[in-house]
């Protein structure tokens, strides 16, 4: 048996001991996520990021984050036609504690998309790439299904290949004209109202009746060079603060941001 001191016991117990537990949230800050002014709901939530330390800037880690929000939440609407549309917003800049977002795409929920695919009908899909007036290159996916004639006794409503080609060409023409003739803000409004799909359904009635025509997905392939002034223009006053009309003593209407406080006067 070796004779000597036990170094572990002489130092007061096990090696390492109990480490001090540090709360990871103590090093993080909350930021408000702001949607562009084309939507009714401006603040869509909050996001968490590590506080700025040395060369690690918090805003650099916030830029590029993508947030997926239902259109019903963005428009404060309980219409079921809006609830299955998801809009993707990407963080492009940070002002104070506000993360300013821009449109980054649109998609349908999986349950809605799968519920539309049924037997005894023809699925027609068109994929179009077009550029907006302000330089955004988009890939638009459109989908539609042939409708059954109410007066017919047939179980199926299949379209001929020549009719499918005509409908797909009509879809491509309408989407190209709508996208290339509008800027991003106007296009997002059209997607929110689903006006493009309604125009396609109405235009294709003479070729073959359609139903469940939707813009299924929109992808942003290319963006113009980032311009802060254009992003601030999309967000109105920049920080997403709502302005209220204040009537001065002379009776003129003055727009002032929410939470405005007059400066303290040194002398009266």
Curated annotation (Swiss-Prot):
Role of this protein? Essential for oogenesis; required for late follicle cell development.
Query: Iron as a keyword?
Result: no
Entry's Gene Ontology BP terms: oogenesis; translation
Query: Positions of the region Disordered?
Result: 1-21
Indicate the quaternary assembly: Component of the small ribosomal subunit. Mature ribosomes consist of a small (40S) and a large (60S) subunit. The 40S subunit contains about 33 different proteins and 1 molecule of RNA (18S). The 60S subunit contains about 49 different proteins and 3 molecules of RNA (28S, 5.8S and 5S).
State the protein's name.
Small ribosomal subunit protein eS1
| Pfam families referenced in this protein's UniProt entry, alphabetically | Ribosomal_S3Ae
Molecular function (GO) terms for this protein are: structural constituent of ribosome
Q: Which gene encodes it?
A: RpS3A
Main localization, broad class: cytoplasm
Q: Which UniProt keywords apply?
A: Cytoplasm, Developmental protein, Differentiation, Oogenesis, Ribonucleoprotein, Ribosomal protein
Query: Does the record carry Protease as a key word?
Result: no
Q: Which PROSITE patterns match?
A: RIBOSOMAL_S3AE
Question: What family does this belong to?
Answer: Belongs to the eukaryotic ribosomal protein eS1 family.
GO CC, alphabetical: cytosolic small ribosomal subunit
Q: Where in the cell is it found?
A: Cytoplasm
- SMART domains hit by this protein: Ribosomal_S3Ae
